[in-house]
Curated annotation (Swiss-Prot):
Encoding gene, per UniProt annotation: ADRB1
Main location class: membrane
Cited Pfam families: 7tm_1
Family affiliation: Belongs to the G-protein coupled receptor 1 family. Adrenergic receptor subfamily. ADRB1 sub-subfamily.
Record's protein name: Beta-1 adrenergic receptor
Disulfide bond annotation, renumbered to this chain: C25-C31
Subunit (UniProt): Interacts (via C-terminus PDZ motif) with RAPGEF2; the interaction is direct. Interacts with GOPC, MAGI3 and DLG4.
Localization: Cell membrane; Early endosome
Entry binding sites for cyanopindolol: S44
Length: 73
């Protein structure tokens, strides 16, 4: 999942913002800023962080409940 979120959009230039500041930076080889568009930043954050967070919390909750059942037996 991380490879798809990171490499594919960057290679396909889906991350590029279209404002003037971003265009100047893209054309300047000395500019080191990574200017992204908002949709890419949100989608990347959700897929890379929030989806795994929810899955992990769900799995840990199930493990915790099962551990509580085992203690009661």
């Amino acid at each position: 999942i991380s490879a798809l979120v990171s490499f594919l959009p960057i290679l396909m230039h889906w991350w590029r913002a279209e404002n003037d500041e971003a265009r100047r930076c893209y054309n300047d080889p000395k500019c080191c800023d990574f200017v992204t568009n908002r949709a890419y930043a949100i989608a990347s954050s959700v897929v890379s962080f929030y989806v795994p967070l929810c899955i992990m919390a769900f799995v840990y909750l199930r493990v915790f409940r099962e551990a509580q059942k085992q203690v009661k037996k």
